[in-house]
Amino acid sequence: MSKSLRVGVVGAGAMGADHIDRINNRTSGAHISAIIEPDAARAAAAAENAPGAQAFTRIEDAIAADAVDAVLIAVPGQFHEPVLVPALEAGLPILCEKPLTPDSESSLRIVELEQKLDKPHIQVGFMRRFDPEYNNLRKLVESGEAGELLMLRGLHRNPSVGENYTQSMLITDSVVHEFDVIPWLAGSRVVSVEVKYPKTSSLAHSGLKEPILVIMELENGVLVDVEMNVNIQFGYQVATEAVFEKGLARIGQPSGMQRWRDGEFLINEHTDFTTRFATAYDRQIQSWVDAVHEGTLVAGPNAWDGYLVALSCEAGVKAFDGGVIPVDAAPRPDFYA
């Protein structure tokens, strides 16, 4: 494909609008040709960054009008399957924001439908795989330079969350990212999940018991613990420490200007994911567009990866009630090798 890829974005909320701006202004080889959004005001606002884009309220209408070559799905997870199905049936390349779908049953339906095509068409938007620091850490793991990887420790901290943030979202909206990137880093899938509760923060709203400590065991024996804290106040922080046989490595440390004054040491910290992972989002979209042009269609997490994450999330939610919850998955199909 030598022409500019015509991308239809489904959903013009904050994430969709961000992707529209990214594709039209910071991505080569693609442009926004359609905005699929039932809310007219949202669609109009997003269209300001996408001159010439057609407006539709349903993905089926955009497909019927031959308005798109590929689809980026940025609606909430519960609406993914109704968009994925017609897009797959039309044979369109898809970048689907996480999660693939909200549960393993619907994710498996998508996996089974996709396998009727000649190759994987879905890339799932777990952007951490495109973060330079995560890539450097994965290269270190694969190189064996520091010996075998023994343990991983993760920090996932948000300054605060709204009243609509529920207990299950600690797993399904937040730790969901670790359930993808940790197996990718370690080269081994999650086989069990456990949740521990430290002392509850007084800043957690009614009905929310946090922070939590999520403990994962991987198939290769690596143990992982992740602190999930959504009321840390000072900023947004995602960091990982890898313990090897011959040393350790850390990523996600604060960057930017450092100051010393009046007996104080001051550093800048991110306030949300849009700055911490800005480069990762840009690289994710550019890699996907390049893959579509090359005919490989997928340059990151695929639908099977999304299915495995759904299984891990379900185990994580069950683990709120105590115990070590197994994550049982069939072998990866050759289609996704």
From Swiss-Prot:
Substrates-to-products reaction catalysed: myo-inositol + NAD(+) = scyllo-inosose + NADH + H(+)
Entry-linked Pfam families: GFO_IDH_MocA, GFO_IDH_MocA_C3
Keyword ATP-binding: no
UniProt keyword terms in alphabetical order: NAD, Oxidoreductase
GO aspect biological process, one term: inositol catabolic process
Gene3D superfamilies: Dihydrodipicolinate Reductase, domain 2, NAD(P)-binding Rossmann-like Domain
EC number: 1.1.1.18
Domain of life of the native organism: Bacteria
GO MF annotations in UniProt: inositol 2-dehydrogenase (NAD+) activity; nucleotide binding
Assembly description: Homotetramer.
HAMAP family: IolG
Family recorded in the similarity comment: Belongs to the Gfo/Idh/MocA family.
Role noted for this protein: Involved in the oxidation of myo-inositol (MI) to 2-keto-myo-inositol (2KMI or 2-inosose).
Protein name: Inositol 2-dehydrogenase
Source species: Corynebacterium glutamicum (strain R)
